């Protein structure tokens, strides 16, 4: 598994040793994304797993460029950077994209995207709810128990949890409900 911090991809082990707060401060000071003035650790970063040029989810998002642009969502290679827009905006975006590409089940999205989110509210609100989801068996990395504990300690020191959302039918449903409750 890898994570993206400020547009730079790190392997999980290397990233776990990295000083996230220092990196975030650097990005803030240099305006890493020239078209997005406030790239913060709280941003939601959506990574498209499908690397093929005709990935249907990615193509669908591109077709709705105006919709995305209004919400200051930008493409960075295969990645989307979505500034924290507020609960209703995020929920609307999820529903909008899902409806427009005519997916019958959120499960279909599981093969196309992963959601990495840094947000303080997740530290307490989702801690218990995602406890059973946190021990995912990642397909591209073997994570030992002690490494996982170390990673979780680091995450609590920074801005939230890293969620590798493999079972999106369950998780995104909860996520949308969680966002709507914050409105």
Curated annotation (Swiss-Prot):
Keywords: Late protein
Induction of expression: Expressed in the late phase of the viral replicative cycle.
Family statement: Belongs to the asfivirus S183L family.
The protein, known as: Uncharacterized protein S183L
